[in-house]
Amino acid sequence: MTAPSTPKPSRKKPKPASPAKPATPREKASLHPRNRHQGRYDFPQLIKSTPELGQFVILNPYGKESIDFADPAAVRVFNRALLKAFYGIAHWDIPADFLCPPVPGRADYVHFLADLLASHNQGEIPRGAAVRVLDVGVGANCIYPLIGYSDYRWQFLGSDIDSTALAAAKAIVQANDLNKAISLRQQGNPKQILTGLLDSTERFDLTMCNPPFHASLDEATRGSQRKWRALGKADPKRKLPVLNFGGQARELWCEGGEIRFVSQLISESASVGQQVLWFSTLVSKASNLPAIESALKKAGALESQVVEMSQGQKQSRFVAWTFKDKAQQQAWSQERWMRKN
């Protein structure tokens, strides 16, 4: 999505937000306990269910089976195999040059959001169609709705400004007969994120977002080159994709970068604050958190959290915030989940 100038929310100034408090970090490289992707992958089993993966399997420098993560085709087929083997998604494909995200990290985000809902439901994760989630910027891959429905049977609405991405996501949804669980909607104004997207009667228990985190195409390319070096693929004689793991320009960068996009998302969330229990977004850089906390205070968020995650050598996090006080949060859970679980 393309981020414009951040609009100023027209609303009364509420009580100051509780400071965003980082969760206690877990052990390095530890996935969420409910994440299906613990340990090494059983490549023979993956190849059995997705035979086309076989042509991409190699031995890494440690003699273990893997794939070449510098090859977008290999990553795409690997994701297809994982989604089929672990989540029962029989048909999955995306157009060339669209973001092909690593599945384990995306699953972690979903599981930690489930924990957030459980904290309002006597420690029990609310499951089924009673829970509605908005995926802001669903992309062609439709990854969060697929995981969230498979693991928790939640209902999803995926939004995007890109009609090609939505067409690809729709093809995935229809091919897997998930039309009743996953809906898609185009944000008609590419300069807006939430504004004008939702009906006034719609309610969502969660929103989630994987924002564009670079401020320019050049910055995105440099970030990709750093990843290639980390993967040991920075061979100047080898032609590599410009952007790591694919990704259209608007998926990876926007004017002002992550801070501007997330600040706008927060600002716009204030206008629909009573329609959503918890908003959330991934944040790629910990150094962006102070600016994001300032945006939360400015928007009038009453509570916020920073949840740290780890996948292999990668450290990631998401920020969650709400415009509801404790009493309103409790009333929400009683009305929407406790009667239906």
Curated annotation (Swiss-Prot):
Task: Tell whether Transit peptide is among the UniProt keywords.
Answer: no
Q: Alphabetically list the UniProt keywords.
A: Cytoplasm, Methyltransferase, rRNA processing, S-adenosyl-L-methionine, Transferase
Q: Name one GO biological process term.
A: rRNA base methylation
Principal subcellular localization? cytoplasm
Pfam families with a match to the protein in the record: Methyltransf_10
The region annotated as signal peptide is none
**Which chain regions cross the lipid bilayer?**
none
One GO term in the molecular function aspect is:
23S rRNA (adenine(1618)-N(6))-methyltransferase activity
Where is the segment annotated Disordered? 1-41
UniProt keyword DNA-binding present: no
Q: Which domain of life is it from?
A: Bacteria
Record's InterPro entries?
METTL16/RlmF, rRNA_lsu_MeTfrase_F, SAM-dependent_MTases_sf
Q: What are the annotated GO cellular component locations? A: cytoplasm
Residue runs in coiled coils: none
Report the protein's function. Answer: Specifically methylates the adenine in position 1618 of 23S rRNA.
Q: What is this protein called?
A: Ribosomal RNA large subunit methyltransferase F
Q: Which organism is it from?
A: Pseudomonas fluorescens (strain ATCC BAA-477 / NRRL B-23932 / Pf-5)
Which gene name belongs to this protein?
Answer: rlmF
